[in-house]
């Protein structure tokens, strides 16, 4: 028996050693190893909330079949109604930076709509008759210049029999004269029709807002149009003018927060210069020059470069290799730092022709890639991303609602377990009825029993680490985040939670 006992003990020793070695490879091993006593206590509290919340959610509604990986829009309402404890903590959690979000889908739709109502230049049109017996059509919005405002001043109301589909009418006039429910019925229609692209006409009136727990943002902005629309509806706003307005808006937010004693909560925001991937190579050259000129004049505002549009449509990165290699060398010659942050690896199928974009993105030295869904099917490319520190902008909710993958098949846990840098991003949150990152962090928390509060801590820190902040800005961001994290942990341990602010649409 002595020999058997010795062998058993040796097996158990090796087993413990193997588990410890594997745990040391976890992406959050540093956060776990260096956890303070307060953090350890907070982890226990949050884990208890998760377990209790899970039981409540599975028994939440007799009319809804609850299951792992269920669709977000259904689960979202149940989370907000039932799992208020864990959800409340996710709202308060300091999330660091928001590194993937499109400007026209970052703000609350209701906020943008109310803002649009204040401007007489904003007009609306529909492409079919508006009748009480048919589904209401999708509206289109656009700010018109003074001459066109006069031209369309006599347009009949949308609900009138003599309205000609496709004709512009003042948004204010259309709302005030809406026959099917009055202004309230009009509001319900407009807000209910808000989807990807539905707010295109009001996108340039969107105000930058600070989501809970987010101290910094890199916002993808469409620079494809050489002139944009001013407040009076005229298309005379240059890219340079736009950056001046953006800079003023950021400074206004900082000044207001400083006056409230909250200046350490918001580091700032930058723009990722984006253009359509349908442009030819010659046309792209103009935009690459423009991007460099703007970076030279506004070094603290331009963060990186990317293409817009679904990866399957338009040109692959291979088509743009010549201008992109030139751009990379030219930025170096001019002393400019404009990293590539490409949308690649979007389709889950490795047989999709756009899947090859992963190869070009890594060879071009991309700083980040997103959605990166297919990266997990390329072991060599995963290893390259890990070794080179190329972060994946993971958008679990957006990937589901865009039909790219189901929640239960999302490769987030695979990427984390393999050690590939990951940052959580919302992508198009306002299109899905929420804002900020709270739901994205909630999903990361509940997607695996091995995830805990310290896992989220590491993900938040990575959003600063893999941002386009310069060294000084990154230092300030880390310091501000650490301060907020300490307060956050104390709040959990002491039980001092503020009541959740849930209205069914906003976080």
Give the residues covered by each predicted segment.
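Metal-cofactor-binding active-site regions of metalloenzymes
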Residues: 2-507
């Amino acid at each position: 028996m002595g020999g058997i006992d010795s062998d058993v003990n040796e097996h158990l020793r090796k087993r413990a050693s193997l588990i410890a070695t594997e745990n040391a490879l976890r992406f959050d091993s540093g956060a776990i190893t260096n956890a303070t006593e307060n953090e350890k206590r907070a982890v226990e509290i949050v884990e208890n909330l998760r377990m209790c919340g899970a039981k409540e959610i599975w028994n939440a509604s007799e009319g809804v079949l609850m299951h792992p990986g269920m669709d977000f829009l259904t689960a979202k309402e149940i989370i907000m109604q039932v799992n208020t404890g864990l959800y409340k903590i996710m709202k308060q959690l300091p999330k660091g930076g928001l590194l993937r979000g499109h400007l026209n889908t970052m703000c609350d739709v209701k906020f943008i709509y109310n803002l649009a109502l204040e401007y007489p230049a904003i007009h609306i049109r529909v492409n079919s008759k508006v009748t009480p017996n048919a589904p209401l059509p999708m509206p289109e919005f656009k700010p018109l210049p003074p001459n066109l405002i006069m031209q369309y001043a006599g347009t009949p109301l949308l609900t009138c029999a003599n309205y000609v589909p496709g004709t512009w009418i003042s948004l204010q006039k259309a709302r005030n004269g809406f026959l099917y429910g009055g202004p309230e019925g009009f509001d319900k229609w407009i807000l209910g029709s808000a989807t990807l692209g539905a707010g295109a006409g009001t996108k340039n009136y969107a105000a930058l807002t600070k989501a809970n727990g987010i101290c910094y943002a890199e916002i993808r902005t469409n620079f494809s149009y050489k002139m944009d629309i001013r407040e009076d509806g005229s298309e005379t706003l240059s890219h340079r003018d736009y950056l001046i307005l953006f800079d003023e808006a950021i400074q206004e937010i900082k000044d207001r927060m400083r006056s409230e004693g909250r200046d350490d909560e918001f580091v700032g925001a930058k723009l990722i210069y984006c253009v359509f991937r349908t442009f030819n190579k010659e046309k792209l050259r103009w935009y690459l020059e423009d991007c460099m000129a703007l970076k030279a004049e506004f070094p603290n505002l331009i963060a990186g470069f990317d293409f817009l549009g679904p990866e399957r449509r338009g040109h692959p990165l291979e088509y743009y290799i010549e201008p992109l290699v030139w751009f990379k060398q030219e930025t170096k010659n001019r002393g400019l730092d404009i990293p590539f942050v490409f949308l690649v690896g979007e389709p889950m199928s490795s047989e999709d022709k756009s899947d090859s974009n992963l190869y070009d993105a890594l060879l071009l030295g991309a700083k980040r890639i997103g959605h990166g869904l297919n990266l997990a099917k390329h072991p060599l490319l995963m290893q390259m991303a890990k070794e080179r520190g190329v972060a994946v902008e993971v958008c679990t909710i957006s990937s589901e609602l865009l039909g790219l993958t189901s929640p239960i098949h999302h490769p987030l846990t695979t990427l984390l377990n393999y050690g590939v840098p990951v940052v959580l991003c919302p992508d198009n949150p306002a299109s899905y009825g929420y804002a900020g990152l709270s739901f994205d962090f909630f999903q990361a928390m509940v997607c695996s029993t091995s995830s805990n509060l310290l896992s989220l801590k590491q993900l938040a820190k990575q959003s600063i680490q893999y941002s386009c902040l310069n060294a000084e800005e990154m230092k300030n961001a880390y310091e501000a985040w650490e301060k907020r994290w300490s307060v956050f942990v104390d709040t959990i341990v002491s039980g001092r939670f503020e009541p959740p602010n849930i209205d069914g649409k906003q976080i």
